[in-house]
């Protein structure tokens, strides 16, 4: 711990992290416990489980969670661990069940997680004490958030401040049209750092940069001028202008972090498509296509990117200390029909090609970080969110000392 404290204290402000933060297994284990086991994570959307008994699994490292809709219509989350000898109860990634039965010894639980059958169990044992372990769960406008902590930080401020912009995009009435998992041979922090900056967007993402004004420095005249058409048409399109920042070093004490910001698309683009033209029916309260894109932060590693006709969700997670993954979800209006209202390949094109490019970038970054010649370098002014992420990350580690 003394070595970690020294490492944190030696870290130069607004410079990239020391190599040990990306390679040390002990630091990685601390990160898992302090950050991933204590943060709210986007697990999915309630449209995935519309009927009683519908469930899907959310897996992270050694943990598996059953997210299930009960007979009462409520959505609950249980740890996928039988209270007998620990076997996984659900083996399929999704399905519909009348009861949850462990495949090992047939211990059986109802949809509320109560143990209802355990053959040959002593009558001295009270089944009420052997319910499935709960996992903390919250719904925000249809989005399912989970937290592995027994005492999670509050998510109430996130709900209060993000409900209005989420309703604007009709989040509750969306469905997942596509889900892709991207493996990344790099430390999870390099993946999150990359997502949090657009310094690389112009040189590395020509498909994105030709349509999204975030490639500019947000303090530049070019960026300011690009915002005017988007802002001038917000009201006409049934939208409102919000700007919410309670993320990373602006996180409110005892609350999960969150943020919302909207920025413009360039002329000729009204959504995140290859040709700038609509991809799907309008969503939420939006009455016409507004030439912009909105970023949501839902905790430290879950993000949304919202256009007038679809929403893209990103969730970053570690696999090992030197590998990670990114789950990407494309969401459209719940009534939209594939092949008629939207073409799946056109829908996913931009963020599929961009994420694949990011994977290459991040892996190359990790290869350089592995070198004996790697040393920290200064962030640019255009990497302000990355600076804030690093500052927040170091504070999380300090709290473990």
Locations of regions flagged by a protein language model:
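Short Pro/Gly-enriched beta-strand edge/turn motifs at strand-loop
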Residues: 37-49, 116-121, 295-300
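Generic structural signal for secondary-structure transition and capping sites
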Residues: 36-40, 87, 200
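C-terminal catalytic domain of Rieske-type non-heme iron oxygenases
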Residues: 80, 143-401
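Short, contiguous pre-domain boundary segments
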Residues: 5-21, 172
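Non-catalytic accessory segments flanking enzyme active sites
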Residues: 17, 21-60, 65
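Rieske [2Fe-2S] iron-sulfur-binding domain
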Residues: 48-168
């Amino acid at each position: 711990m003394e070595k970690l404290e020294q490492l944190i204290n030696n870290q130069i402000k607004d410079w990239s992290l020391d190599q040990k933060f990306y390679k040390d297994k002990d630091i990685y284990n601390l990160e898992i416990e302090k950050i991933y086991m204590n943060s709210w994570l986007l697990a999915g959307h309630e449209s995935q489980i519309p009927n009683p008994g519908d469930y899907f699994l959310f897996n992270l490292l050694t943990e598996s969670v059953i997210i299930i809709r009960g007979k009462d219509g409520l959505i609950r989350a249980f740890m996928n661990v039988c209270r007998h000898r620990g076997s996984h109860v659900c083996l399929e990634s999704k399905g519909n069940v009348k009861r949850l039965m462990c495949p090992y010894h047939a211990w059986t639980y109802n949809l509320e997680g109560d143990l209802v059958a355990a053959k040959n169990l002593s009558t001295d044992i009270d089944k009420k004490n052997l319910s499935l372990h709960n996992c903390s769960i919250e719904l925000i406008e249809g989005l399912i958030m989970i937290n592995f902590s027994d005492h999670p930080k509050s998510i109430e401020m996130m709900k209060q401040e993000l409900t209005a912009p989420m309703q604007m995009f009709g989040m509750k009435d969306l469905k997942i049209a596509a889900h892709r998992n991207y493996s990344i041979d790099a430390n999870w922090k390099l993946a999150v750092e990359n997502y949090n900056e657009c310094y690389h967007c112009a040189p590395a993402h020509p498909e994105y940069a030709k349509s999204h004004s975030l490639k500019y420095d947000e303090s530049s005249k070019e960026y300011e001028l690009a915002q005017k058409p988007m802002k001038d048409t917000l009201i006409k399109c049934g939208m409102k202008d919000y700007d919410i920042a309670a993320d990373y070093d602006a996180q409110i004490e005892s609350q999960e972090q969150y943020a919302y910001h909207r920025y413009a698309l360039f002329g000729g683009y009204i959504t995140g498509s290859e040709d700038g033209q609509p991809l799907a029916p309008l969503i939420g309260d939006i009455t016409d296509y507004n030439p912009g894109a909105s970023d949501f932060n839902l905790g430290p590693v879950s993000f949304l990117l919202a256009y007038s006709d679809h929403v893209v969700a990103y969730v970053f997670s570690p696999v090992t200390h030197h590998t990670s993954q990114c789950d990407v979800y494309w969401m459209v209006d719940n009534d939209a029909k594939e092949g008629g209202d939207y073409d799946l390949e056109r829908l996913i094109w931009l963020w599929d090609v961009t994420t694949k490019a990011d994977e290459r970038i991040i892996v190359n970054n990790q290869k350089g970080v592995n070198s004996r010649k790697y040393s920290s370098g200064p962030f640019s002014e255009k990497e302000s969110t990355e600076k804030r992420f690093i500052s927040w990350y170091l504070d999380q580690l300090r709290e473990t000392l």
